Amino acid sequence: MVNFGGATENDRKKIVITKDSKAFFHNNVDYCVGTGRMGLALTEEYQEELRLVQKEIGFKHIRGHGLFCDDMAIFQTYEEDGKVRVEYNYTYLDRVMDAYKKVGLRPFLELGFMPKKLASGSQTIFYWQGNTTPPKDYDMWCNMVHSLLRHLMERYGEEEVIQWPIEVWNEPNLCGFWENADMQEYFKLFHRTFDAIKEVNPGFRVGGPAVCGGTDEKWIQAFMEYCHENHIPVDFVTRHHYTIDPPECIGHYAYS
């Protein structure tokens, strides 16, 4: 039981399940499909496979890594009059979003990873080197989130975009995805990002911590407590459905 907001033993609900018990099954298997990095959707081969997936299954949402990675080229800096200035380029993002829209998919936005020029460190993950360190400037990060959402609403309409769930980062409880798996630093990122999103439109649904196995119970408990103590009305809580135990490793392959 997750103790959120001072829940007590009296708040527990006892459920008895017998072999004859029946209940409605909320089948969410087609709610969202995971993909690799978002930049893959820029290729024709990927889009062909996506059309096939939608024809055969028909998912509602799609979630992928690397929205803010350098291959998407959103975060750009240049020097003018002796000052470093920031601008945002959405050319590739628009192509990806358009590809999703053509096959009837809505994005499940995962905000990450860190643009190299905004990163506080050099740690990366995967061959495409997604930076997994906190922002060196949280104000610049929040400005980037602001700009992203405003652009999406301008292009696809406010009523459409607020139906896209937003998740802050990916699996911060794993050192590879978040430097040192620093829980408090992630909570800071979530808090600042949550506020930034709601400033654009309070109708956006924002969630986390998007954890994966192992320490998930500890993280979710702490996350809920942090949200309660800091008056963050989180819209949903996510945990990725992998094994609880560490995977068995044979050579460089891991099996769950």
Model-derived features: positions:
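Short intrinsically disordered, low-complexity coil segments enriched in acidic
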Residues: 1-4, 252-256
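Mature N-terminal, pre-catalytic/accessory segment of carbohydrate-active enzymes
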Residues: 1-60, 64-65
